[in-house]
UniProtKB/Swiss-Prot annotation:
UniProt short sequence motif Cx9C motif 2, positions renumbered to this chain: 37-47
Protein name: TP53-regulated inhibitor of apoptosis 1-B
GO molecular function: phosphatidic acid transfer activity
Stated family: Belongs to the TRIAP1/MDM35 family.
Positions of the CHCH domain: 5-55
């Protein structure tokens, strides 16, 4: 799947490969220490945020789940 911004697609693929490799080779084998893909994700996220802004895609009112939100907090249920 391509990214929302064409200029971000290569970064997305690079991050996806990094994450999938880390998940399969480390995390699933019990090594949850560190995520070597953090910097790739940060750069990809910045690219996507810029693309959303440049394309004037409205995101107001959209709830995003982040590391500090559980699904029930994000969707308003308990």
């Amino acid at each position: 799947m391509n990214s929302v911004g064409e200029e971000c697609t290569d970064m997305k693929r690079e991050y996806d490969q990094c994450f999938n490799r880390w998940f399969a080779e480390k995390f699933l084998k019990g090594d949850g220490s560190g995520d070597p893909c953090t910097e790739l994700f940060r750069r990809y996220r910045e690219c996507v945020q810029k693309a959303i802004k440049d394309k004037d895609i409205p995101v107001d009112g959209v709830d995003f789940m982040g590391p500090s939100k559980s699904k029930t907090e994000a969707d308003g249920s308990s």
